[in-house]
Amino acid sequence: MEQHFNTPSEVIDTNMKAGEGKAHLPLGKMILLGIMAGAFIALGGATSSTAAHAIDNVGLARFVAGIIFPVGLMIIVFVGGELFTGNCLIVMDVVGKKVTWFECIRNLIVVYFSNLIGALIIDTLICFSGNLDYTGGLLGAYAIKVAVGKVGISPLKGITSGILCNILVCIAILMAVAATDIVGKVWAIFFPIMAFVVGGFEHCVANMFYIPVGMMAAQNPVYVAKAQEAYGLTAEQIQGLTILHSLNNFIPVTIGNILSSSSAIR
Protein backbone atom coordinates (compact mmCIF):
# COMPACT_ATOMS: atom_id res chain seq x y z
CA MET A 1 0.00 0.00 0.00
CA GLU A 2 1.28 3.45 -0.92
CA GLN A 3 2.19 5.57 2.12
CA HIS A 4 0.81 9.11 2.04
CA PHE A 5 2.77 10.47 4.99
CA ASN A 6 6.24 10.34 6.48
CA THR A 7 6.90 8.10 9.48
CA PRO A 8 7.81 9.65 12.86
CA SER A 9 11.49 8.77 12.40
CA GLU A 10 11.46 10.30 8.91
CA VAL A 11 9.80 13.42 10.30
CA ILE A 12 12.49 13.85 12.96
CA ASP A 13 15.31 13.26 10.48
CA THR A 14 13.83 15.71 7.95
CA ASN A 15 13.23 18.35 10.60
CA MET A 16 16.76 17.97 11.97
CA LYS A 17 18.21 18.49 8.48
CA ALA A 18 16.06 21.62 8.16
CA GLY A 19 17.20 22.80 11.59
CA GLU A 20 20.84 22.36 10.62
CA GLY A 21 20.21 24.53 7.56
CA LYS A 22 18.46 27.18 9.65
CA ALA A 23 21.35 27.41 12.10
CA HIS A 24 23.83 27.94 9.26
CA LEU A 25 21.89 30.59 7.32
CA PRO A 26 23.80 33.77 6.39
CA LEU A 27 22.96 36.57 8.83
CA GLY A 28 21.24 38.80 6.28
CA LYS A 29 18.99 36.01 5.03
CA MET A 30 18.20 34.97 8.60
CA ILE A 31 17.10 38.51 9.45
CA LEU A 32 14.99 38.89 6.30
CA LEU A 33 13.24 35.54 6.81
CA GLY A 34 12.68 36.41 10.48
CA ILE A 35 11.04 39.71 9.54
CA MET A 36 8.81 37.89 7.06
CA ALA A 37 7.70 35.33 9.65
CA GLY A 38 6.94 38.00 12.26
CA ALA A 39 4.85 39.87 9.70
CA PHE A 40 2.94 36.74 8.66
CA ILE A 41 2.08 35.82 12.26
CA ALA A 42 0.99 39.41 12.90
CA LEU A 43 -1.29 39.28 9.87
CA GLY A 44 -2.86 36.14 11.31
CA GLY A 45 -3.37 37.97 14.59
CA ALA A 46 -4.83 41.04 12.91
CA THR A 47 -7.31 39.15 10.76
CA SER A 48 -8.40 36.81 13.57
CA SER A 49 -8.98 39.80 15.87
CA THR A 50 -11.07 41.48 13.18
CA ALA A 51 -13.21 38.35 12.86
CA ALA A 52 -13.68 37.81 16.61
CA HIS A 53 -13.77 41.27 18.21
CA ALA A 54 -17.54 41.81 18.17
CA ILE A 55 -18.49 38.34 19.47
CA ASP A 56 -19.57 38.46 23.12
CA ASN A 57 -19.32 34.73 23.86
CA VAL A 58 -15.68 34.07 24.81
CA GLY A 59 -15.63 30.47 23.62
CA LEU A 60 -17.18 31.32 20.28
CA ALA A 61 -14.87 34.31 19.82
CA ARG A 62 -11.81 32.14 20.43
CA PHE A 63 -13.16 29.48 18.09
CA VAL A 64 -13.60 32.02 15.30
CA ALA A 65 -10.14 33.46 15.95
CA GLY A 66 -8.75 29.93 15.96
CA ILE A 67 -10.14 29.29 12.49
CA ILE A 68 -8.40 32.36 11.05
CA PHE A 69 -5.11 32.60 12.97
CA PRO A 70 -3.42 29.46 11.51
CA VAL A 71 -3.06 31.23 8.16
CA GLY A 72 0.06 32.91 9.55
CA LEU A 73 1.98 29.66 10.04
CA MET A 74 0.61 28.26 6.78
CA ILE A 75 2.12 31.20 4.89
CA ILE A 76 5.45 30.68 6.66
CA VAL A 77 5.53 26.98 5.74
CA PHE A 78 4.63 27.55 2.08
CA VAL A 79 6.26 30.93 1.35
CA GLY A 80 9.18 30.81 3.77
CA GLY A 81 10.18 32.44 7.02
CA GLU A 82 12.11 31.91 10.22
CA LEU A 83 9.80 31.71 13.24
CA PHE A 84 11.33 31.83 16.73
CA THR A 85 8.94 29.33 18.30
CA GLY A 86 9.44 26.82 15.50
CA ASN A 87 13.19 27.33 15.55
CA CYS A 88 13.26 26.24 19.19
CA LEU A 89 13.29 22.75 17.64
CA ILE A 90 16.91 23.41 16.60
CA VAL A 91 17.76 22.17 20.09
CA MET A 92 17.18 18.70 18.61
CA ASP A 93 20.17 19.32 16.34
CA VAL A 94 22.23 20.44 19.33
CA VAL A 95 21.44 17.19 21.13
CA GLY A 96 22.25 15.30 17.92
CA LYS A 97 25.57 17.20 17.70
CA LYS A 98 24.66 18.62 14.27
CA VAL A 99 24.65 22.21 15.59
CA THR A 100 26.57 23.87 18.40
CA TRP A 101 24.90 25.68 21.30
CA PHE A 102 26.42 28.93 20.03
CA GLU A 103 24.86 28.47 16.58
CA CYS A 104 21.49 27.58 18.12
CA ILE A 105 21.44 30.56 20.48
CA ARG A 106 22.65 32.92 17.74
CA ASN A 107 19.81 31.81 15.49
CA LEU A 108 17.18 32.15 18.21
CA ILE A 109 18.32 35.65 19.23
CA VAL A 110 18.53 36.94 15.66
CA VAL A 111 15.20 35.39 14.65
CA TYR A 112 13.45 36.60 17.83
CA PHE A 113 14.26 40.25 17.22
CA SER A 114 13.69 39.91 13.47
CA ASN A 115 10.21 38.52 14.23
CA LEU A 116 9.66 41.57 16.44
CA ILE A 117 10.58 43.93 13.61
CA GLY A 118 8.21 42.17 11.22
CA ALA A 119 5.36 42.23 13.72
CA LEU A 120 5.92 45.93 14.49
CA ILE A 121 5.74 46.75 10.79
CA ILE A 122 2.30 45.12 10.59
CA ASP A 123 1.25 46.77 13.89
CA THR A 124 2.04 50.16 12.40
CA LEU A 125 0.32 49.44 9.10
CA ILE A 126 -2.80 48.17 10.89
CA CYS A 127 -3.04 51.34 12.99
CA PHE A 128 -2.66 53.66 10.00
CA SER A 129 -4.94 51.58 7.75
CA GLY A 130 -8.08 52.35 9.74
CA ASN A 131 -8.60 48.67 10.55
CA LEU A 132 -9.04 49.46 14.25
CA ASP A 133 -11.98 51.78 13.42
CA TYR A 134 -14.21 48.77 12.68
CA THR A 135 -17.50 48.63 14.58
CA GLY A 136 -17.24 52.25 15.67
CA GLY A 137 -13.77 51.76 17.13
CA LEU A 138 -14.66 48.57 19.01
CA LEU A 139 -11.79 46.72 17.31
CA GLY A 140 -9.38 49.33 18.67
CA ALA A 141 -10.92 48.90 22.13
CA TYR A 142 -10.61 45.13 21.77
CA ALA A 143 -6.92 45.52 20.93
CA ILE A 144 -6.46 47.51 24.14
CA LYS A 145 -8.35 44.92 26.19
CA VAL A 146 -6.28 42.04 24.83
CA ALA A 147 -3.02 43.89 25.49
CA VAL A 148 -4.06 44.81 29.05
CA GLY A 149 -4.84 41.17 29.77
CA LYS A 150 -1.50 40.03 28.41
CA VAL A 151 0.71 42.51 30.30
CA GLY A 152 -1.14 41.62 33.50
CA ILE A 153 -0.28 37.92 33.33
CA SER A 154 1.64 36.40 36.24
CA PRO A 155 5.13 34.90 35.61
CA LEU A 156 3.91 31.37 36.43
CA LYS A 157 0.94 31.64 34.09
CA GLY A 158 3.16 33.12 31.38
CA ILE A 159 5.67 30.26 31.56
CA THR A 160 3.12 27.45 31.75
CA SER A 161 0.89 28.94 29.06
CA GLY A 162 3.97 29.45 26.88
CA ILE A 163 4.91 25.80 27.31
CA LEU A 164 1.42 24.62 26.34
CA CYS A 165 1.36 26.93 23.34
CA ASN A 166 4.66 25.92 21.82
CA ILE A 167 4.04 22.23 22.36
CA LEU A 168 1.13 22.66 19.94
CA VAL A 169 3.15 24.87 17.57
CA CYS A 170 5.98 22.31 17.44
CA ILE A 171 3.43 19.55 16.86
CA ALA A 172 1.95 21.56 13.97
CA ILE A 173 5.38 21.98 12.39
CA LEU A 174 6.26 18.30 12.76
CA MET A 175 2.85 17.23 11.44
CA ALA A 176 3.34 19.51 8.42
CA VAL A 177 6.65 17.73 7.78
CA ALA A 178 4.81 14.40 8.06
CA ALA A 179 2.34 15.41 5.35
CA THR A 180 3.46 14.90 1.75
CA ASP A 181 1.05 17.21 -0.08
CA ILE A 182 -0.25 20.76 0.29
CA VAL A 183 -3.72 19.79 1.50
CA GLY A 184 -2.25 17.51 4.14
CA LYS A 185 0.11 20.23 5.33
CA VAL A 186 -2.73 22.76 5.58
CA TRP A 187 -4.80 20.51 7.84
CA ALA A 188 -1.73 19.40 9.80
CA ILE A 189 -1.05 23.04 10.67
CA PHE A 190 -4.67 24.05 11.15
CA PHE A 191 -5.81 21.88 14.05
CA PRO A 192 -2.88 22.27 16.51
CA ILE A 193 -2.71 26.04 15.92
CA MET A 194 -6.47 26.37 16.28
CA ALA A 195 -6.18 24.43 19.54
CA PHE A 196 -3.64 26.85 21.01
CA VAL A 197 -5.73 29.88 20.04
CA VAL A 198 -8.95 28.39 21.43
CA GLY A 199 -7.05 27.41 24.58
CA GLY A 200 -5.87 30.99 25.00
CA PHE A 201 -2.23 29.94 25.32
CA GLU A 202 0.61 32.47 25.05
CA HIS A 203 2.82 32.74 21.96
CA CYS A 204 5.66 35.26 22.19
CA VAL A 205 5.68 36.14 18.47
CA ALA A 206 1.89 36.52 18.30
CA ASN A 207 2.18 38.79 21.34
CA MET A 208 4.59 40.95 19.33
CA PHE A 209 1.43 41.87 17.43
CA TYR A 210 -1.16 41.92 20.20
CA ILE A 211 0.72 43.94 22.82
CA PRO A 212 2.25 46.69 20.62
CA VAL A 213 -0.96 47.18 18.63
CA GLY A 214 -2.82 47.58 21.93
CA MET A 215 -0.24 50.11 23.08
CA MET A 216 -0.69 52.04 19.84
CA ALA A 217 -4.48 51.88 20.12
CA ALA A 218 -4.22 53.25 23.67
CA GLN A 219 -2.96 56.53 22.19
CA ASN A 220 -6.34 57.07 20.51
CA PRO A 221 -8.91 58.67 22.87
CA VAL A 222 -11.82 57.18 20.91
CA TYR A 223 -10.54 53.63 21.40
CA VAL A 224 -9.72 54.34 25.05
CA ALA A 225 -13.23 55.62 25.76
CA LYS A 226 -14.72 52.63 23.99
CA ALA A 227 -12.50 50.23 25.97
CA GLN A 228 -13.58 51.80 29.25
CA GLU A 229 -17.23 51.67 28.25
CA ALA A 230 -17.34 48.20 26.66
CA TYR A 231 -14.85 46.32 28.85
CA GLY A 232 -14.77 48.30 32.08
CA LEU A 233 -11.06 49.01 31.83
CA THR A 234 -9.68 51.68 34.14
CA ALA A 235 -7.42 54.56 33.13
CA GLU A 236 -4.69 53.02 35.30
CA GLN A 237 -4.89 49.69 33.45
CA ILE A 238 -4.66 51.41 30.08
CA GLN A 239 -1.79 53.63 31.21
CA GLY A 240 0.00 50.43 32.22
CA LEU A 241 0.46 49.55 28.55
CA THR A 242 4.14 50.46 28.40
CA ILE A 243 7.26 48.83 26.99
CA LEU A 244 8.46 48.09 30.53
CA HIS A 245 5.20 46.39 31.52
CA SER A 246 5.17 44.42 28.27
CA LEU A 247 8.21 42.55 29.60
CA ASN A 248 5.88 41.06 32.25
CA ASN A 249 4.53 39.01 29.36
CA PHE A 250 7.42 38.64 26.94
CA ILE A 251 9.98 37.30 29.42
CA PRO A 252 7.97 34.44 31.00
CA VAL A 253 6.15 33.55 27.77
CA THR A 254 9.41 33.38 25.82
CA ILE A 255 10.92 31.18 28.53
CA GLY A 256 7.87 28.90 28.36
CA ASN A 257 8.02 28.72 24.57
CA ILE A 258 11.69 27.73 24.76
CA LEU A 259 11.15 25.13 27.48
CA SER A 260 8.46 23.41 25.42
CA SER A 261 11.03 22.45 22.79
CA SER A 262 12.39 19.88 25.25
CA SER A 263 9.23 17.84 24.61
CA ALA A 264 10.46 17.20 21.07
CA ILE A 265 13.86 15.80 22.08
CA ARG A 266 14.11 12.06 21.56
Regions found by a protein language model. Give the residues of each.
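Alpha-helical transmembrane segments and their helix-helix packing motifs
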Residues: M1-R266
